[in-house]
């Protein structure tokens, strides 16, 4: 497990950045952190699918693609799956991954009580290093409706960006994996996260309406939720992010200080106005 380096917090006044600007700037970091979490989830699920089926179904288009240039090995004695991207390989969506993701598992993920613990060894997505420990525990399985409910805890989470800045994260979330009427894989996420942003300031994120991710959107290069609402707080300043009504796009509505605007989201840590 990676140890997060402690550092002195700086105030908005000392840093010369007002809180409303911090929320605006830091939300781009939130998008990147959330995208990194989803990326890791997709990769580890794909590796899981190599060795066992979920409800007798596969999703070859996505599963195979994300592991195209990775070496995946399973140690059945110690119950460890190692996903190795080597010195770096570019996926079909333009993301370059390097290093290793290590999954310690116990039980079939369709079984209540089974778990997966995910750690990283020098793992990067593009120029951003991903660290921390993610533990996933299955709490409910509904075979009739083809859904699995999982509690996920992130401890010691950290992203270190190419410019040397970093952000930390602790999170507690619940995810429900299911298939909709069209057969698309849909994930709903609830929960919260907190940490220290790239400016050294404490932040908190609360999901106030469940986030919805669609695997078909991932195929189209959309790595953000298609619907759901977040509340993002830095100091006394709060922003509300509404991801919309299910469209496969990178657009969201940000409301801050009573002013709403449409924004375009970038998973590489920058926010572009629409």
Q: Model-found features: residue ranges?
A:
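Sec-dependent signal peptide recognition
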Residues: 1-3
């Amino acid at each position: 497990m990676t140890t997060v380096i402690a550092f002195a917090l700086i105030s908005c006044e000392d840093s010369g950045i007002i809180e409303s600007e911090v929320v605006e700037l830091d939300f781009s970091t939130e998008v990147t952190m959330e995208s990194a979490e989803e990326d890791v989830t997709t990769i580890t699920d794909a590796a899981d699918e190599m060795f066992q089926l979920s409800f007798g179904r596969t999703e070859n288009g996505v599963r195979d693609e994300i592991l195209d240039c990775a070496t995946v090995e399973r140690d059945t004695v110690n119950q460890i799956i190692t996903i190795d991207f080597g010195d770096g390989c570019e996926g079909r969506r333009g993301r370059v991954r390097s290093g290793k993701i290590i999954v310690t598992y116990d039980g079939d993920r369709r079984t209540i009580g089974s778990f997966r613990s995910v750690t990283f060894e020098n793992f990067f997505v593009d120029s951003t290093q991903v660290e921390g420990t993610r533990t996933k525990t299955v709490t409910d399985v509904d075979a009739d409706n083809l859904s699995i409910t999982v509690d996920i805890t992130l401890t010691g989470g950290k992203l270190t960006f190419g410019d040397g800045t970093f952000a930390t994260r602790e999170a507690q979330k619940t995810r429900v994996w299911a298939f909709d009427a069209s057969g698309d894989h849909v994930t709903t996420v609830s929960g919260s996260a907190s940490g220290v942003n790239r400016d050294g300031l404490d932040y908190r994120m609360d999901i106030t309406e469940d986030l919805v991710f669609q695997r078909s959107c991932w195929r189209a290069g959309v790595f953000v939720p298609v619907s759901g609402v977040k509340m993002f707080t830095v100091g006394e300043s709060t922003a509300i992010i509404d991801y919309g009504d299910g469209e496969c796009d990178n657009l969201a509505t940000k409301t801050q200080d009573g002013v709403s605007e449409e924004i375009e989201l970038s998973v590489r840590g920058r926010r572009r106005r629409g």
